[in-house]
Amino acid sequence: GVNYFDTSPAYVQGLSERATGIALKRHPREKFFLATKLSNFSPSTHSREESLAMYHRSFRDLQVDYIDYLLLHGIGMGGMEALRSRYLDNGMLDFLLKEREAGRIRNLGFSYRGDIRIFDYLLSRHGEIKWDFVQIQLNYVDWKHAKEVNTRNTDAEYLYAELVKRNIPAVIMEPLLGGRLSRLNDHLMARLKQRRPQESVASWAFRFAGTFPDVLTVLSGMTYMEHLQDNLRTFSPLVPCTEEEFTLLEDTAQRMLQYPTVPCNDCKYCMPCPYGLDIPAILLHYNRCINEGNVPQNSQDENYREARRAFLIGYDRSVPRLRQANRCSGCGQ
């Protein structure tokens, strides 16, 4: 079954920890592992007072006496200045180390996105801090092509290798690249289905991430019971990818990157929009239409009218009109 639950004060409009605490309260505490984060992204929460309040609120909302895995959330976003303001200058990292020593935090780590210099800096302090784990984005596209997806990212191959050098276990986020690896276009999907016709396309991405021996666990954001059941089939037990399958997935990644999609992982860090746009939904609809061939190059394309109609009908179904891109003011926020 599933026994590792990942949450954050920032998820589900601030309600995720409370909901997680209610859901897990019925189970014996020793039967599950709970991961949450110090998500003090906003400058208004950088102070020691506000950061401490967020930390203690996590315990209250989760209804627990200790946290199994506590993460410095999203280090790398904002560079060294943000890292210093959020965790170093305010003494929060020192505080969390003392909390680990006291047993209220069982394992201390960080999740990484963005500036690679911050990742390298924190690993350079491993001898002093003794990171228990690190959460990285790893999937068969980001393994060698992270910068082709997002120029701010770093190849997972490098991130994972740096953790292995230091014997730091890796927790994997975005194994499906924000769901994109479960929504391949028909041609790419057919190539994987030909090899394993009874298995889902998503299972290939999970098997890829789970094959690496220093992976502690692979996170999965599941919406439906079918997702959970598919994941349980994939991991119980996990069948590691063969070298031939690694080659197939690398070829799939290269072919996928030829499609001009927007590098959106549906993380929702761009939300809320001050003008009410549903930014992730807009980008995901566009990407889906690209993969399905419903975005013509120009008005001279033979199938322009048909593709335009399919795009707009799907757009209205996917995104409420008051939240569509035509309401964007270009505010840059």
Task: State where each predicted segment sits.
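Short, acidic/polar
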Residues: 1, 46-62, 114-124, 201-206
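Structural motif corresponding to the early beta-alpha repeats
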Residues: 27-52, 73-76
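Active-site groove signature of glycoside hydrolases
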Residues: 59-83
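Beta/alpha (TIM)-barrel catalytic core signal, keyed to glycine-rich beta->alpha loops juxtaposed to Asp/Glu
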Residues: 75-277, 281-284, 291-307
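Short Fe-S-cluster ligation motifs
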Residues: 292-331
